[in-house]
From Swiss-Prot:
Enzyme Commission code: 6.3.4.20
Organism this protein belongs to: Shewanella piezotolerans (strain WP3 / JCM 13877)
Lineage: Bacteria, Pseudomonadati, Pseudomonadota, Gammaproteobacteria, Alteromonadales
Keywords attached to this entry: ATP-binding, Ligase, Metal-binding, Nucleotide-binding, Queuosine biosynthesis, Zinc
Protein name per the record: 7-cyano-7-deazaguanine synthase
EC class of the enzyme, as a word: ligase
Keyword Nucleotide-binding: yes
Length: 228
């Protein structure tokens, strides 16, 4: 029996990954992390979506210590700054977040004998976060396998997709409207189309507009990438 764990926030990317995973594995278990994020509504949305979509289980883990150790606009009452310098790390970056999340997901995978951890990180539209890059993911996979003496794959279905192609993937599984209206990506905690002004909303909306303007082209691009 194949088992996978989805690192699940209830946002566009992780929900799209969950929808796909449910077609690929016998059991799909979700894990959500409470790290004191400002957009805390995502935790409740993650609970609702994991149940609605049919995940085998859903765990919410308290990692509030991350908020104690780090200072980020995602966890503190700090204005979210626009990252005008593409080489700079934005102030929404939470240092160590994906290191911690993937480590805990790896421990969970060990306990339930799952061989795959799925995360929605993406290098194409990675917002300047160093822990969303493919090089980091491969390093984490190696560290987890060596540290636990277990065969484990960290799967990143969105790694080389842009936001328009991520919308195409949701549409491929007839879930574009669900992802659009029932997920939470907004840094200000607004469901669906969000506030429209934070960096996450701008990136998400631009991708949606591009996809809707030429869905046939993006579906073809998605199909080509999925067969590479």
């Amino acid at each position: 029996m194949s088992k996978a764990i989805v690192v699940f926030s209830g946002g566009q990317d992780s929900t799209t990954c969950l929808i796909q995973a449910l077609t690929q594995y016998d059991e799909v278990h979700c894990v959500t992390f409470d790290y004191g994020q400002r957009h805390r509504q995502e935790i409740e949305i993650a609970k609702e979506l994991s149940s609605k979509l049919g995940a085998s289980s859903h765990q919410v883990l308290d990692v509030g210590i991350l908020n104690d150790l780090t200072v980020s606009a995602l966890t503190r009452d700090i204005p979210i700054e626009e990252n005008k310098d593409g080489n700079a790390i934005p102030n929404t970056f939470v240092p160590g977040r994906n290191i911690l999340f993937l480590t805990l997901a790896g421990i969970y995978a060990y306990q339930i004998n799952a061989d795959v951890i799925i995360t929605g990180v993406c290098e194409t539209d990675f917002s300047g976060y160093p822990d969303c890059r493919n090089e980091f993911i491969k390093s984490m996979q190696t560290a987890l396998m060596q540290g636990m003496d277990k065969q484990l794959t960290i799967s990143t279905p969105l790694m080389w997709l842009d936001k328009a192609e991520t919308w195409a993937l949701a549409d491929k599984y007839n879930s574009l409207e669900l992802v659009r209206h029932q997920t939470l990506t907004c840094y200000n905690g607004l469901k669906g189309d969000g506030c429209g002004t934070c960096p996450a909303c701008i990136l998400r909306q631009r991708g949606l507009d591009e996809y809707l303007a030429n869905s046939t082209m993006y579906q073809a691009q998605l199909a080509a990438k999925c067969t590479e």
